[in-house]
Amino acid sequence: MGNIHIQTKSKEYDVHVGKEALSHLTMIVQNMQPAVSNVMIISDEAVASLHLQTVIDALQVEQDVFSFVVPSGEKEKSFENFYAAHTSALENKLDRNSLILALGGGMIGDLAGFVAASFMRGIRFVQVPTTLLAHDSAVGGKVAINHPLGKNMIGAFHQPEAVVYHTPFLQSLPKKEWRSGYAEVIKHALIGDVELYHWLKEEVQTLADLRDEKLIHILTKAIPVKANVVSQDETEKGVRAHLNFGHTLGHALEKELGYGNITHGDGVAVGMLFAIFLSEQVYKVNLAYEDMKQWFLKYGYPKMPRDLNVERLVQLMKQDKKANAGAIHMVLMQEYGVVNVVSISDETVHIALEAFQKDMV
């Protein structure tokens, strides 16, 4: 069992990680001041069928507990479900002392968090992540829904009261979701914990190694990387953008291929490889791109699709939240553990993407 303390300018809270983390949930709710009036659990159909009753049973409180369940999938992080959640909250008489509990992966955490941020101008919420990917999204307070023209374009910064990372919930994940979440673990290692990066290369030979004590070790090492960045820059005015390493191309791939047709982590993995590929050219350094590519492929991460239109990807990358005055800004790597946000011309990105696409045969 491991506890990680998160400190930001707006709030302090704990991340409870381990096989018995769910046992903390009742005390977390009971200790809140002012007292919680009622609880609304937001989940998706897949997670609810597996874990909703377990959480309700663990939540031994006197307050009324309601649930709002949406279909599964990234495309459900929509305005329609956001609006429907508000309707459910009003129908169940939630008020400013109510608590929203986000039970699910990153999609649910984002959706439920944004509902909490906006309902009556902001009420409290707790994250109960059920995926490895959510070790990233559940911490830091970024909550959002998607717009047809871009991912996470409508949202807010709203920190949770706590994060309860009950690792047994992860055991039901399909292989593609383990791989997706592991990409964000790799990202945290590359940008902020080089020792963790070397440990991963030695200790995680296959995705099946992401279990038991190794899993808890990974979570208690990767989450503090994000916590450290968020403590310095809660609202992404500076160094927090470093957490977007791999995301400029990754988000473009998700948008171009269609949400749900490529997992977030697979997109980020391709994006990280491209960022390393481009970083070697921009900084004139050797980042062992070829070794990194083989390491990623060993885990089953996809190659850059050969049939995608490069110019279309460039235009999508210009819609990224880091873009400024229509110019692409990417997180590039000077060396392992040292990254910077860099403005890159469309032409440079286009040429590099074409070369990267050909290299990923």
UniProtKB/Swiss-Prot annotation:
<dbReference type="InterPro" id="IPR030963">
    <property type="entry name" value="DHQ_synth_fam"/>
</dbReference>
<dbReference type="InterPro" id="IPR030960">
    <property type="entry name" value="DHQS/DOIS_N"/>
</dbReference>
<dbReference type="InterPro" id="IPR016037">
    <property type="entry name" value="DHQ_synth_AroB"/>
</dbReference>
<feature type="binding site">
    <location>
        <begin position="72"/>
        <end position="77"/>
    </location>
    <ligand>
        <name>NAD(+)</name>
    </ligand>
</feature>
<dbReference type="GO" id="GO:0005737">
    <property type="term" value="C:cytoplasm"/>
</dbReference>
<dbReference type="GO" id="GO:0003856">
    <property type="term" value="F:3-dehydroquinate synthase activity"/>
</dbReference>
<feature type="binding site">
    <location>
        <position position="247"/>
    </location>
    <ligand>
        <name>Zn(2+)</name>
    </ligand>
</feature>
<feature type="binding site">
    <location>
        <begin position="130"/>
        <end position="131"/>
    </location>
    <ligand>
        <name>NAD(+)</name>
    </ligand>
</feature>
<keyword id="KW-0479">Metal-binding</keyword>
<protein>
    <recommendedName>
        <fullName>3-dehydroquinate synthase</fullName>
        <ecNumber>4.2.3.4</ecNumber>
    </recommendedName>
</protein>
<dbReference type="Pfam" id="PF01761">
    <property type="entry name" value="DHQ_synthase"/>
</dbReference>
<comment type="similarity">
    <text>Belongs to the sugar phosphate cyclases superfamily. Dehydroquinate synthase family.</text>
</comment>
<feature type="binding site">
    <location>
        <position position="142"/>
    </location>
    <ligand>
        <name>NAD(+)</name>
    </ligand>
</feature>
<dbReference type="InterPro" id="IPR050071">
    <property type="entry name" value="Dehydroquinate_synthase"/>
</dbReference>
<dbReference type="GO" id="GO:0008652">
    <property type="term" value="P:amino acid biosynthetic process"/>
</dbReference>
<keyword id="KW-0547">Nucleotide-binding</keyword>
<dbReference type="Pfam" id="PF24621">
    <property type="entry name" value="DHQS_C"/>
</dbReference>
<keyword id="KW-0456">Lyase</keyword>
<dbReference type="InterPro" id="IPR056179">
    <property type="entry name" value="DHQS_C"/>
</dbReference>
<comment type="pathway">
    <text>Metabolic intermediate biosynthesis; chorismate biosynthesis; chorismate from D-erythrose 4-phosphate and phosphoenolpyruvate: step 2/7.</text>
</comment>
<comment type="function">
    <text>Catalyzes the conversion of 3-deoxy-D-arabino-heptulosonate 7-phosphate (DAHP) to dehydroquinate (DHQ).</text>
</comment>
<keyword id="KW-0963">Cytoplasm</keyword>
<dbReference type="GO" id="GO:0046872">
    <property type="term" value="F:metal ion binding"/>
</dbReference>
<dbReference type="GO" id="GO:0009073">
    <property type="term" value="P:aromatic amino acid family biosynthetic process"/>
</dbReference>
<dbReference type="GO" id="GO:0000166">
    <property type="term" value="F:nucleotide binding"/>
</dbReference>
<feature type="binding site">
    <location>
        <position position="264"/>
    </location>
    <ligand>
        <name>Zn(2+)</name>
    </ligand>
</feature>
<feature type="binding site">
    <location>
        <position position="151"/>
    </location>
    <ligand>
        <name>NAD(+)</name>
    </ligand>
</feature>
<keyword id="KW-0028">Amino-acid biosynthesis</keyword>
<keyword id="KW-0520">NAD</keyword>
<keyword id="KW-0862">Zinc</keyword>
<keyword id="KW-0057">Aromatic amino acid biosynthesis</keyword>
<feature type="binding site">
    <location>
        <position position="184"/>
    </location>
    <ligand>
        <name>Zn(2+)</name>
    </ligand>
</feature>
<dbReference type="GO" id="GO:0009423">
    <property type="term" value="P:chorismate biosynthetic process"/>
</dbReference>
<keyword id="KW-0170">Cobalt</keyword>
